[in-house]
Amino acid sequence: MKHKAKDIIASGDWTYGPEWPVIGLDIGSRGSKGVLLVEDEVYTALIPTGLYMQETADDLLGRLLAESGLQRSDIAFIVGTGYGRISLKYDDIPYKVVTEISCHAMGAHAALPETRTIIDIGGQDSKAIKIDPATGKVVEFVMNDKCAAGTGRFLEKAAALLGIELDELGPVALESKDPAPVSSQCVVFAESEMISLRARGERNNDLEARANIAAGVHLSAARRVHNLLGRVGIEPGLAFTGGVSNNPGMWQVLETLLKSKFQVPKLDLIFAGSLGAAVYAGKHAAASPEVAAKYQARPFVWSKADSPAAVNDAVEVEFDRSLAC
């Protein structure tokens, strides 16, 4: 999807426009995201992660090039991040990997410049990140990657047990007035509790029980994440990134626990990691003598008229964004 940079940055002050086209690729465990920066325009693409990470990355790259009207040879630099970053290789384009924590921090900072504290909930882990609001650099972070509790995978299992689609789980939870008790310490215990609670609800043919279980699941996951935040400290300027940031139930319960509101982004922060990777790609390109020599020999010329006009939805494959991590 094509965006004007000024339309997706909260402050309207876009200072990340690179001199040459750069790309950030965030290859997640379930979904993969790409961002292409060129002048004052931002292109995004979102697809499910396939079996082979390189093929997924190449698919994203092709979609971004098709939408922007650019050629592969025009790209100055690519930065890869996310679960599959170490599997990627490019022989014809300068490429580096940057950790997903650094990229989520930089992406949140670029989209929401007041950000100081980030919650990132993905399919396999959750993170609490404190950043320097002046630079977007990570100051401190903690993560939960040892247990599925507090992750998108936990929510996915809950939705399956309740017999609903994952994107329905959040809205169903919002219908609850009395969240059911669900363990926040272990996903195995939580699953057992959900089965028992569901059985009682089914015996009573009680849709209210389903909503209460869904709300309890969200509260359980949110408490796990809240504990992570307590270890890094919570400062004003909260940002919520990752696929689970699209879940309205999780958004609400976290705000309740935190007694604070998340900043509302103009760009879906499922793209935080890939946006941050693209920003880092711009920095690497600017510092590279090899890249400078390439464009000195063949100056980059791009006409916005080359960008296809009717492709706004063509580059995003429809699938459940709430676990596109």
Question: Which ranges hold each PLM region?
Answer:
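Short glycine-rich, Thr/Ser-proximal phosphate-binding strand/loop in the N-terminal lobe
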Residues: E19-R63, V138-D145
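Glycine-rich phosphate-binding loops at beta-strand->alpha-helix junctions
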Residues: G82-G84, I234-L257, D268-G273
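Conserved phosphate-binding/catalytic loops in two-lobed NTP-binding clefts
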Residues: Y95-I101, E255-L275
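Adenine-nucleotide phosphate-binding core of ATP-dependent small-molecule kinases
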Residues: S192-L228, I270
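Glycine-rich phosphate-binding loop plus the immediately following alpha-helix
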Residues: T49-M53, P133, K137-E175, G273, ...
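Gly/Thr-rich phosphate-binding beta-strand-loop-beta motif of the actin/hexokinase/Hsp70
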Residues: I8-V42, T115-T135, C325
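Acidic, glycine/GT-rich loop-and beta-edge segments that sit at the periphery of enzyme/chaperone cores
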Residues: K2-K6, K283-C325
